[in-house]
Swiss-Prot record:
The keyword Cell inner membrane does not apply. Its main location: membrane. Residues 1-26 form the signal peptide. This is Protein FAM174C. It comes from the Eukaryota. Keywords: Glycoprotein, Membrane, Phosphoprotein, Signal, Transmembrane, Transmembrane helix. It comes from Homo sapiens.
Length: 132
């Protein structure tokens, strides 16, 4: 048997995960500039509990960043869903019912009208007469 080929959805999922992980790794490991190529002594290793430590955290994100990308995207999607629901609610309540069109005798059943036949040779025509 030949090499196993990944299914397209699984392949797309792996590609999306790699692309999502790529910016995280790019922030942490910046390329060296030509001035940094010179050898320098390694920085002193300090304990995170010492007073000079910037923060006591196990997260690798910079101190200015808040939350993970997944949390932020969840809030963005939640906001879009909320705006969509608000749009449809406003549209439903502002929707005015169309006024009934009145077609004379068909819509006006309360008027006392009488239909009388007019005799003619070709066809029978009815005349509407109001009996008020």
């Amino acid at each position: 048997m030949g090499p196993r080929v990944l299914q397209p959805p699984l392949l797309l999922l792996l590609l999306a995960l790699l692309l999502a992980a790529l910016p995280c790794g790019a922030e942490e490991a910046s390329p060296l500039r030509p001035a940094q190529v010179t050898l320098s002594p390694p920085p002193a290793v300090t304990n995170g509990s010492q007073p000079g430590a910037p923060h006591n955290s196990t997260h690798t994100r910079p101190p200015g960043a808040s939350g993970s990308a997944l949390t932020r995207s969840f809030y963005v999607i939640l906001g879009f869903c909320g705006l969509t629901a608000l749009y449809f609610l406003i549209r439903a309540f502002r929707l005015k019912k169309p006024q009934r069109r009145r077609y004379g005798l068909l819509a006006n059943t309360e008027d006392p009208t009488e239909m009388a036949s007019l005799d003619s040779d070709e066809e029978t025509v009815f005349e509407s007469r109001n009996l008020r």
